[in-house]
Every structure is written in structure tokens, then in C-alpha cells.
Amino acid sequence: MVKKILIVFGTRPEAIKMAPLVKIMENRNDVNFRVCVTGQHRQMLDQILNIFDIKPDYDLNIMQENQDLYDITLKILCGMKNVLNDFKPNIVLVHGDTTTASVTALAAFYQKIKIAHVEAGLRTYNICNPWPEEANRQIIGVLANIHFTPTVKSAENLIKEGKNKEGIFITGNTVIDALFYMTEKIKNDKTFKIKVLSSIGNEYKINDNKKFILVTGHRRENFGEGFLQICEALKIIAINNPDIDIVYPVHLNPNVQKPVKMLLLNISNIYLINPLKYEEFIYLMSKSYFIITDSGGIQEEAPSLGKPILVMRETTERPEAVEAGVVKLVGACKQNIIRESQKLIDDQDEYEKMSKAYNPYGDGRACEKIINILIKGKNNESI
């Protein structure tokens, strides 16, 4: 019997990591699948759908101004009920730790539909950090039947929690599949590369003779005092290193925009630019000297590009990169951010040690493994 699989995502990071799965399924005749998007990140989500040429079968279009997690949860739960009743899938595929993923898993559970969780088993075991993501992924972990983990450590987390070993599969992370897809496209498609360079050039002129630090920040737990500390640190780094640029694509959330513009707007070597399209960000990341971020996905991507990463969080659910030496936790602490950034700028040995291009998150074949398991099951047996 041909499996009916519903793929659900709603944010830009989810879309990036699920897109390679969708593209592979499009070329297979042994699966009946549909794509549902919630629109949790409307504008940024649509950019990813366009670049990967994905046309959703269902769009809940939930995003409205000033809505909170209660609003998002209610809209997704009610919307998914209608989608599940219409398509009647055998398996619902969700990704990661978003509200879209956790509420979709709950909706599927209510209809006794099997749930497959991509990027399963990540844990900080601090329910409030990151918030609400840690709670989301633990909720999905309880509800899911099939767990696709990116690493051995994430699989071990699930086993320690008492999850059924027969439902746990180590596949690597699909974000590496997406990264390789996009870097190859930029490399081999000259027209596409010219378009990417032209678009970036409208925001920041890359100079191969000048180093730049790439910054991203958007985590809820850093709102308020955390972002003030981050911005103060960036300001001091910029002033102390006038020969190095800081490039910061600023998230659209007002909680990010306000402190960033208040503290960083008029510093000559800090470039506050608009959020970038995925392909533009990948290229900018590949050209950067190092990266300061609170993003989970960048912790997974940057090691493949040989970029040191300073993570502005107290904990990480991706300890493999820390253990590999390519990621260092600095928190939202001004002194830590300044100290570790200056070390990478001044100490070539430290930079070389962190920039070794070893990625513990996979070989770019995670999607292929996931689909084969979904279709055939373990040892070619149906799930």
C-alpha cells in the first residue's frame, strides 16, 4: 500500500530543513504526500518556498500582527483538524521544536495518526531555555512514533527517556542536505550566483580584502536585557576593531529591532541590513570570518563551511559542535561576547582551532535515509 504522508512546517528554519525531503519525494512514485504550511513566519517562509519551488497543498495562513502563543496554538490546532480530516494521512511528518511542530503532533495524536519527528532528541533539559522550544520538542518526543535523530547523542537522549529503540533512527541533519543543495546551486548556476551577489550588494558590499563578522539574533529568552547586552558588546567590538565590519541582518521582531537600532544604528563599521533570503545568507555565511548567533540552525550549518561560531545562549541542545570545538557558548553576556570575539580576531591559533571544517551533523544524505525508512521501514519492513 502506498503511504500517505503529510509534511507540515510553518517557519523559515523548518522550511529550509524540510525542503530537501519534499524535493526528493516529488521524484518518487512510491509515496503519496501533501505539504501543509501554517504560515507561522509568513514572509520569511514564502521566500524558502519560492527558492525551492515548493507549492503547498494546504496553507493555514495563521500569521497576524500582535498574536501570542495562545493565538498561534489555537489556530494551528483547529486548522490541522480540517487538514487531517481532508487528507487522512498514515503518517504526519513534523520538524524540530516550533509551536507548529508541537501543535501539529498533538492534532495528529488526537486522530491516532502516526507521528514522525525530524531532528528528534535534541535536549537542554532546561524547560525554559530555549523557551518555548525545549518544551515543544519534549512534547513531540512523547507523542511521536518515529524519531529521526541527527546524531548519536540525540538518539541516546531518547533512549534514556525510555523511548522505543525500534522507532529511533540516526540519519544526520537535513539542514546539511539543504546547505549542500544551495552551495552547489550557487557554484554551478552562474545566472543564479550573479542574482545572489547583486541582491546582497544592495545591502552590503563584500570586499575580499576586508574581514567581516556575521551576526544574527532573535531568541525570545534574550529579549530585553539580553539584547541590550548583545548590542553593547557589538558596539565595543566594532569601535575596538575599525578595520573589521560587523554585518547584522536584523530580525523583523520589534523586540529585536528596537535595541539594535537604538545602540548600533550610527556606527560606521556596523551594517544593519534587512533579513536575507536563504541563498543570500548562505553565501554571506561562507564569506564571513566568524559568526555570532543565537540560532540553532547556524550551529549546524557553519561547521561545514569552516566558520567558528560564538553562540549567545547559556545552553545548547547541539552539544556535538561544542565538543568538536567549532562552537563556543558565550551567553547574552557583554564581557563574554567581547572577550571571545577579540580572541578570534587576535589569536590565529585559536581561530584555526575553531575553524576546522568538521561537521558532526551529517553528510548531506539525511533526507534519503528518512524517506527510505518511512517507505520501507527498518530492514526493509513496513513501519
Curated annotation (Swiss-Prot):
Its EC number is 5.1.3.14. Signal peptide: none annotated. GO terms for molecular function: UDP-N-acetylglucosamine 2-epimerase activity. InterPro entries: UDP_GlcNAc_Epimerase_2_dom, WecB-like. Pfam families: Epimerase_2 (PF02350). It comes from the Bacteria. It catalyses: UDP-N-acetyl-alpha-D-glucosamine = UDP-N-acetyl-alpha-D-mannosamine. Pathway: Capsule biogenesis; capsule polysaccharide biosynthesis. Keywords: Capsule biogenesis/degradation, Isomerase. NCBIfam families: wecB. Belongs to the UDP-N-acetylglucosamine 2-epimerase family. Non-hydrolyzing C2-epimerase involved in the biosynthesis of capsular polysaccharides. Catalyzes the C2 epimerization of UDP-N-acetylglucosamine (UDP-GlcNAc) to form UDP-N-acetylmannosamine (UDP-ManNAc). This is UDP-N-acetylglucosamine 2-epimerase. The gene is HS11.17.
